[in-house]
């Protein structure tokens, strides 16, 4: 490992040593010796020692039931500790000093100055900067909340140990604390015994805000200010909020029957309670600090003549926040309310105005340094989080709205709405939207499903404007899908305009998105209410599952490009909302590269993107890590707007059209066309066992009796990642490139790699995926778990994978994958030593469980779940 990563190597070794001591104390030296023997055999196996590989297989296939859990836990926990050390490395003082990122804001501002980009243009672009991250409860976060706190504490210890001026006693004390935390993690059950409820998931999301983002947002704003002042001599306005958060947790009911209107109501109250509690803590600090006596005459006239004028204002806010916390606490505990709503804070302006007045008065009285301290941080938090803590998105599938309207139209004698032609649906919806009379009959009793839809809309109607950020329609296909939701909201009593966002997910829907939006923009009623602003969500996971990575990527690019052009032509401000996952098969890519590969002008109104599952923890779980993530997002958005990527040449488009068609055909010929594929998939991966893992609150299938098409994108990806074939992330992509090269297009493809960020990012993503695949392990799953008559399919896929790797290497002109990113290659090689035993153990456990499905051994089931979470940690992504 290079010298600049010596801190990381030392930390990994130290944490591994402490884990070994913990295991020895808890389980005895014999177990530790067994674990160490497996580790050495795995290392030698990876180095090409066939005898070591055979011995490793023999050791893991004959392991006793009482030893499987500690062995699985040891390797799983080591991989978690490696992740902690790697996450800390990104914010380590020594690492930051040694590695100046050319992707940072600081580097971008220097580059803009060097390229003589006008300062006014930079400043105006920064003023419009918006990074809106949407936290989602997708069941990819396999780490329990009870462990997350311990992992954060381990990070803090690593940070303190990096100080050079520690005494021997201080260093010993910190290392002892590390050992305690690792022991606590070891003695904590890492597998949930029950699925989390949506409210449990909401608590997890709130914890991320409280423990990390609350500090990270003002820290990032301060950092942005420093760069602006240094390079352009200006300050970022306190009124602006470059970072905002929304959440799907408690609002996303697509396919999740456990998210009800009551769930949404409860989560909204929990958010308000926590926001009031967090602001109360800030205000208490301010009330102690602001003992200043001087203020402006305007301030004194507004708030009274007091010896300590700021303290009086702040203490008044403190009293209101105390009552606000108590008010929402009583609701959450189902207690009768004892507090008058006139005595609590319900609107951000009630908190903002007095604090902003304090800020301005301090500035005008020559106390800028005081104003720009904790008070400024608090103002930034009001603009970012507000009294609702985060905005909430509502999401539901289009068919649910259609069924609700069909029930209504049948009851009032108009026939079945779902059977009408699209033109008739639109005419009916526009007529009802324009009418002042209600559509819903007074004494009508809807079905429970329709009642739930209407109740959700009523919960929205009860919220102040802005608390609910938008209503997303998954599987949106037509203009009537959007108008239908507007009508349901109107009938529920929503008096303000709420953005209704179509989510285009499948290949066909992405290709039709321009036509759907054109129809909507041509509806007079619709243009009248949207105020020339439109949000459209682009689905990455379902389109990739539908058509393969390459075809989906190109469809997403073209859809965005067409929507940008359409909205510019129509005079509509477009915000594109990206529904990405953490994995390549679900649209994941390093944030900076992914954003610079977007179509030109697609980020001019900011970025809205989902942050999912374990990616929230990796990218936002620590304040300093979150600041780095914001910095990368901000620099990519600003670069995309100030130094936009090139428009693709027509020859590049022609190649991409060809690659899209051929890759989709190759992908579908396997996934849909081979009758043996589904039984092969179900036996070669732990897909069926995954459904038993109590990850998220949402069921893993839309239809419990369906095939691959009914499986959600997340378990689809997760299952293939477990057996190291990682099929969804590459199937069809490189094969289509190889076909195109054979037709004589190599020169054009190499030009695309060099000059087109969209294409080079796709190639880089494929290279990353290939570096995590393993044909030997995949074959081991087949030989032990798959019927012999299906082996041909796995063999064919592995041969294709190896050919695809050669194709990508021929484009990079390298002998090894990831040659240009040696640190990542090193990291994967290190992890393989610990992930391989988990894969081999998983095969053995699956074999044992499937041999006796009627009477599963609880220890075997528990160990299997540990291998699943451990492999997820080793791969650094799940779904």
Curated annotation (Swiss-Prot):
Q: Which domain of life is it from?
A: Bacteria
Look at the named UniProt entry and state the broad enzyme category this protein falls under.
lyase
* Entry EC number(s): 4.1.1.31
Q: Which cofactor does it need?
A: Mg(2+)
Q: What is this protein called?
A: Phosphoenolpyruvate carboxylase
Q: Which NCBIfam families match?
A: PRK00009.1 (NF000584)
Q: Which HAMAP family match?
A: PEPcase_type1
Q: Sum up the protein's function in the record's words.
A: Forms oxaloacetate, a four-carbon dicarboxylic acid source for the tricarboxylic acid cycle.
Q: Sorted alphabetically, which PANTHER family does this protein's record hold? A: PHOSPHOENOLPYRUVATE CARBOXYLASE (PTHR30523:SF6)
Which residues participate directly in catalysis? 138, 545
N-terminal signal peptide: none
Question: Per its record, what are the GO molecular function terms?
Answer: magnesium ion binding; phosphoenolpyruvate carboxylase activity
Q: Name one GO biological process term.
A: carbon fixation
| This protein's record includes keyword Lyase | yes
By its UniProt entry, which InterPro entries does this protein fall under? Answer: PEP_COase, PEP_COase_bac/pln-type, PEP_COase_Lys_AS, PEPCASE_His_AS, Pyrv/PenolPyrv_kinase-like_dom
- What SUPFAM superfamilies does the record tag this protein with? Phosphoenolpyruvate/pyruvate domain
């Amino acid at each position: 490992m290079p010298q600049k990563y010596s801190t990381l190597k030392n930390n990994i070794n130290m944490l591994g040593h402490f884990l070994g001591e913990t295991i020895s104390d808890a389980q005895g030296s014999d177990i530790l010796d067994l674990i160490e023997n497996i580790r050495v055999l795995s290392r030698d196996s990876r180095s090409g020692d066939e005898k070591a590989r055979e011995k490793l297989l023999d050791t893991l296939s004959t392991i006793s039931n009482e030893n499987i859990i500690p062995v699985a836990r040891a390797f799983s926990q080591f991989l978690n500790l490696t992740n902690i050390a790697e996450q800390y490395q990104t914010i380590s003082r020594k690492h930051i000093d040694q590695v100046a990122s050319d992707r940072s804001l600081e580097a971008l501002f220097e580059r803009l100055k060097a390229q003589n980009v006008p300062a006014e243009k930079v400043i105006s672009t920064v003023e419009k900067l918006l990074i809106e991250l949407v936290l989602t409860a997708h069941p990819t976060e396999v780490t329990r909340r009870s462990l997350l706190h311990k992992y954060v504490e381990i990070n803090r210890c690593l940070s303190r140990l990096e100080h050079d001026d520690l005494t021997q006693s201080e260093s010993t004390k910190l290392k002892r604390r590390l050992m305690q935390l690792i022991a606590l993690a070891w003695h904590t059950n890492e597998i949930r015994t029950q699925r989390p409820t949506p409210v449990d998931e909401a608590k997890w999301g709130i914890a991320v805000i409280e423990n990390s983002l609350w500090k990270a947002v003002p820290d990032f704003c301060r950092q942005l200010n420093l760069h602006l002042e240094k390079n352009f001599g200006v300050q970022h306005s306190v009124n602006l909020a470059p970072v905002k958060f929304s959440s799907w947790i408690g609002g996303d009911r697509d396919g999740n029957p456990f998210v009800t209107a009551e769930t949404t109501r409860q989560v909204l109250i929990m958010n308000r309670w926590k926001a009031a509690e967090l602001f109360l803590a800030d205000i208490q600090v301010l009330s102690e600090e602001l003992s200043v006596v001087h203020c402006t005459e305007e301030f004194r006239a507004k708030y009274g003549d007091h010896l300590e004028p700021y303290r009086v204002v702040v203490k008044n806010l403190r009293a209101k926040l105390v009552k606000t916390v108590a008010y929402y606490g009583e609701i959450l505990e189902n207690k009768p309310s004892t507090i008058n709503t006139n005595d609590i804070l319900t609107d951000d302006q009630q908190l903002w105005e007095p604090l902003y007045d304090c800020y301005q008065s301090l500035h005008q009285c020559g106390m800028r340094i005081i104003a720009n301290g904790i008070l400024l941080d608090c103002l930034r938090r009001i603009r970012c989080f507000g009294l609702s803590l985060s905005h909430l998105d509502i999401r539901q599938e289009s068919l649910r709205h259609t069924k609700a309207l069909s029930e209504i139209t049948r009851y009032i004698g108009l026939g079945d709405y779902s059977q009408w032609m699209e033109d008739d649906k639109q005419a009916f919806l526009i007529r009802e939207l324009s009418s002042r009379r209600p559509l819903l009959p007074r004494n009508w009793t809807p079905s429970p499903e329709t009642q739930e839809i209407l109740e959700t809309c009523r919960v929205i109607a009860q919220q102040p404007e802005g608390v609910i950020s938008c209503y997303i329609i998954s599987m949106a296909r037509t203009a009537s899908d959007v108008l239908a939701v507007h009508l349901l909201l109107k009938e529920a009593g929503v008096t303000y305009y709420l953005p209704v966002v179509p989510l285009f997910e499948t290949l066909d829907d992405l290709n039709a998105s321009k036509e759907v939006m054109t129809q909507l923009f041509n509806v007079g009623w619709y243009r009248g209410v949207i105020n020339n602003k439109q949000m459209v969500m682009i689905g990455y996971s379902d389109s990739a599952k539908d058509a393969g990575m390459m075809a989906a990527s190109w469809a997403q690019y073209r859809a965005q490009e067409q929507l940008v052009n359409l909205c510019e032509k129509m005079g509509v401000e477009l915000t594109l909302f990206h529904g990405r996952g953490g994995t390549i098969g679900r649209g994941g890519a390093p944030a900076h590269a992914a954003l610079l590969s977007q179509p030109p002008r697609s980020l001019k109104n900011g970025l809205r993107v989902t942050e999912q599952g374990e990616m929230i923890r990796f990218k936002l779980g620590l304040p300093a890590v979150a600041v780095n993530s914001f910095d990368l997002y901000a620099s990519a958005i600003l670069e995309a707007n100030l130094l936009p990527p090139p428009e693709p040449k027509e020859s590049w488009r022609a190649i991409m059209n060809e690659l899209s068609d051929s890759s989709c055909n190759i992908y579908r010929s396997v996934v849909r066309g081979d009758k043996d594929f589904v039984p092969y998939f179900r036996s070669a991966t732990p897909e069926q066992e995954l459904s038993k893992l109590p990850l998220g609150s949402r069921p893993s299938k839309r239809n419990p009796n369906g095939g691959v098409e009914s499986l959600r994108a997340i378990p689809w990806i997760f299952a293939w990642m477990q057996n190291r074939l990682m099929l969804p992330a590459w199937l069809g992509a490189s094969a289509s490139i190889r076909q195109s090269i054979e037709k004589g297009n190599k020169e054009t493809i190499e030009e695309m790699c060099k000059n087109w960020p969209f294409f080079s990012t796709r190639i880089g993503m494929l290279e990353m995926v290939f570096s995590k695949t393993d044909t030997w392990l995949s074959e081991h799953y087949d030989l032990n778990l798959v019927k012999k008559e299906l082996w041909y399919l796995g063999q064919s896929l592995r041969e294709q994978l190896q050919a695809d790797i050669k194709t990508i290497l021929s484009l990079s002109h390298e002998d090894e994958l990831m040659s240009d990113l040696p640190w990542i290659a090193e990291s994967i090689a290190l992890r393989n030593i610990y992930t391989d035993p988990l894969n081999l153990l998983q095969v053995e456990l699956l074999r044992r469980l499937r041999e006796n499905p009627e009477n599963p051994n609880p220890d075997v089931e528990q160990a299997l779940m540990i291998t699943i979470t451990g492999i997820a940690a080793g791969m650094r992504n799940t779904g």
